[in-house]
């Protein structure tokens, strides 16, 4: 599957450092536009905090809407980094090399964005401290530490800390490379961040062992984070469609599906914007598409299991909710779009190699997947709260306000803005990984055919 490309070190340095040493012409206008969107979003968030949640479409009984849906979505996107970097690093998959750093970055910035939504959803963000530490002793009131709302920030904070450390350890050799190629304040910055890296055998060994250990340590956190997020819903028996024991694995595999698809989207953009055709190649998209076929099919199985579990109990409210999701307007339209975009359109297309190696088709199908996965979270959260029951006299339909949609758009602008800022100071494709790949790969003769192979020393 891997095609042999011989690239010398000078060419690799020149191409992969062009974002840091020579700014592309499109970079500044794009960052300015994104910066304006980010400032507009921050202004809207400030107005909402000042005015209260009354400016949103949230009302009884739908108190969880667009904000919590987007929170779950970004936590799911963050699973891309560990899926691509940690698991594929442990399995020594060669095709991971161009995509590891972008996936790790997506993890860190997605988690930073996800943390914003519970804060603003609280209405009074300054009182979040009461979730983390005891109330004043005079009142004798303490937070319920068994609540998922307490476990969420703990799990996400741990995941964010580990992911940041994981990213930084892998960045050290490239920081030293930049230190040796820059002058002035940039040289001082890279000198501090490189931590005295000289590339001697002892440092390389420690960096390699550190990456493997962090990969292994991050795997249980990777599983636990979205499991805990799923328990925000699974431990609420009063809402139909939420109280399900299958939610933890269902959410985790759905997160991997959306996260890896987001990495495909980002890889295509990196290839087009920075002209990295020699580093991000069609075979990398082919490998990720094969991975996505497996993950998406597993996710589809859990989707059917979740539906079967709901219907198996013959509980009238559960059956009424499923009828509402699939047969009542507008939920039925959203359900059809969700199912088409998350599986029925992209996965059959990925079965053909000419689609898997077509970067444009992979780009658009990966976007379709994340449209579908966002709708999946929306259909899990909102219909269960919005379903009208005969004994609830204070209900209203949920209509997301312009404030909610603006903050939703802000989240995408914010993540993209952070990615472009990072690309200005640090390489998005790890240089040392590319150079190591050139050392490890070679052409070998098998019979009369010459094929690419990975050569490693035996222990």
Where are these regions (language model features)?
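N-terminal regions that are enriched for targeting/export leaders
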Residues: 1-71, 76-77, 447-459
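Central hydrophobic cores of alpha-helical transmembrane segments
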Residues: 361-371
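Transmembrane alpha-helix boundary signature
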Residues: 46-51, 118-130
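Hydrophobic alpha-helical transmembrane segments
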Residues: 75-83, 337-348, 414-415
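Membrane helical hairpin/interfacial module
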Residues: 62-126
